[in-house]
Amino acid sequence: MSLEKMGQAAREAAYQLATVSTAQKNRALAAIADELEARSHQILAANEKDIAAGRAAGLSDAMLDRLLLNPARLAGIVADVRKVISLDDPVGAEIDSRVLENGLRLSRRRVPIGVIGVIYEARPNVTIDIASLCLKTGNASILRGGRETFHSNLELVRVIQSALAASGLPRDAVQYIDNPDRALVGELLRLDRYVDMIIPRGGAGLHKMCKENSSIPVIIGGFGISHIFVDESADLARSLAVIDNAKVQRPSACNALDSLLVHEKVAATLLPQLVGLMNERKVALVATPEAMPLLAGADSLRAAGPEDFDTEWLSLTLGVKLVADVNEALAHMREHNAGHSDAILTNDLANAERFVNGAGSAAVYVNASTRFTDGGQFGLGAEVAVSTQMLHARGPMGLTELTSYKWVGLADYLSRA
């Protein structure tokens, strides 16, 4: 099917979904969860093809891990779908209302956005996350996954479409571009006659390409250098535990710590302790000249180059820099692409407020790890993306962020004076 026809079919499906009840949508989601379990062997077999192709192509172990589905991960995906069922449906909710002097009762009511195009890389669970959130909010979706998970995604979408048809909902509510030709991405970005929003999920290059080539509004997010600033007043022992969590728990995540900024007055105490912990975790350190002597015992240490503090590591590598105060920390963050998740560790309330107000990040933390920026952790259920832009949505995008609103006026045959 051509993209033009996919767009037409998605638009028609979106019209139908806009009038579907919450109960109908939940039944479809339950059918998807049931069918994922029933067809687990086919899904895992398809994923094995992707893993074998990835190994043959020389993909790193970290990338192969992102591609991998196994029984435990598939069970987690099923659990996520069932959790979406339990979440409140925002569609139809009244945001606010008032009665005008002329008697018109005016309200704002949440509605689906329409058709959402999602371009993503690697993780096959994203296919189910996006489809389930879009369905719950009455949106149709056109998905374009990475070639690395081609077989997995095809099988997952077959499961979704089968469950939709069995539930009496249009199969075309979730469609997958099954041609790996990259030219089709550009074609999707220009399908503004049918597609209402584009969500890219991947690296900085993908986001840049979508932003520059799309005639459709694009949600920019997922990329950003994550910082922790250790202030002069911080509890250093407890700070080490937070730094360890932010860097090591899942280093390939977009909310993992990239750059550690340390107040110069506590650096001589903190950094030697950090070295032992990072050696144990096999973390490579990249440091500015003034920090190098304090990190001398590190197993892996090199001087920072011009690009290092602009690098989203997605691995066991950590940049380290000394700063004079919270203002210098904020200045560094502005210069080096902060925008996703950043934190201050401090016992000084004024500095905490200065950091929260001055950081331009989608999520800012005081005395907490950057790893909390996640739809599940925020109580939003699964997320479709983490937006780092100012307009429409910011931070983890859950159900509410996949809706718009319409004005509804109720009256008794009222005419304008």
Swiss-Prot record:
Which HAMAP family does the UniProt record give? ProA
> Which example biological process does GO assign this protein?
L-proline biosynthetic process
What function is annotated for this protein? Catalyzes the NADPH-dependent reduction of L-glutamate 5-phosphate into L-glutamate 5-semialdehyde and phosphate. The product spontaneously undergoes cyclization to form 1-pyrroline-5-carboxylate.
Task: Provide the E.C. number(s) assigned to this enzyme.
Answer: 1.2.1.41
Q: Which family does it belong to?
A: Belongs to the gamma-glutamyl phosphate reductase family.
Its top-level enzyme class, in one word, is: oxidoreductase
Keyword field: Amino-acid biosynthesis, Cytoplasm, NADP, Oxidoreductase, Proline biosynthesis
Q: Which GO terms describe its molecular function?
A: glutamate-5-semialdehyde dehydrogenase activity; NADP binding
Entry GO CC: cytoplasm
What are the annotated disulfide bridges? none
Pathway(s) of this molecule: Amino-acid biosynthesis; L-proline biosynthesis; L-glutamate 5-semialdehyde from L-glutamate: step 2/2
Q: Where in the cell is it found?
A: Cytoplasm
* Protein name, per record: Gamma-glutamyl phosphate reductase
**Which reactions appear under catalytic activity for this entry?**
L-glutamate 5-semialdehyde + phosphate + NADP(+) = L-glutamyl 5-phosphate + NADPH + H(+)
Gene3D superfamilies recorded:
Aldehyde Dehydrogenase, Chain A, domain 1, Aldehyde Dehydrogenase, Chain A, domain 2
Q: Which Pfam families match?
A: Aldedh
